[in-house]
Swiss-Prot record:
This is Probable pseudouridine-5'-phosphatase. CDD domains: HAD_AtGPP-like. Mg(2+) binds at D15, D17. Pfam families: Hydrolase. It comes from the Eukaryota.
Amino acid sequence: MANKVLRKVTHCVFDMDGLLLDTERLYTVATEMILEPYGKTYPFEIKEQVMGLQTEPLARFMVEHYELPMSWEEYARQQRANTEILMRNAQLMPGAERLLRHLHANKVPFCLATSSGADMVELKTAQHRELFSLFNHKVCGSSDKEVVNGKPAPDIFLVAAGRFGVPPKPSDCLVFEDSPNGVTAANSAGMQVVMVPDPRLSQEKTSHATQVLASLADFKPEQFGLPAFTD
């Protein structure tokens, strides 16, 4: 991938699942618990298609793709029940806490923009309440009425930017994502996007990001005009 021009930004917007919290692995287990009784498997090629989707489109896709004898509502209910059990001990991804505390200490405004509903965000962040209190605000796509269309549509990022005290231009926002759907949404919103993808994703699925990193620990804020780490 050719080097892309990195533009100075003033605000940051973070996805949550698979980026800040190690939840994608737990989602896989929760999904396999539903599929196993029907003799179905959940290969990565399917998982990468639904990463970043909100509850209803994800559930509709799974029921249709696997021809499951249930409604999308029932699928979503089972997924939620499994997830509630598994997510209580979700751990932070490498580099996440350092970056968030650095931005907060340097008064760089940042917010959360996740496809999860507000109640699931509360559940997943239960072990990290203080850290997640540092966000200026949280936009929870599956339960926020202003987010009409989920990722890959740009709605969630535009809503998130609009809720800062002094809303920045989209071009002044830097999005952090792990999913192709999220990257597409950020690009459509007119924002730069740093992607920390699952290493199994093909280069084709990561090529539209402004920058691709193996970990948030590799992020260099000064490349986007933000204060550099001093530790």
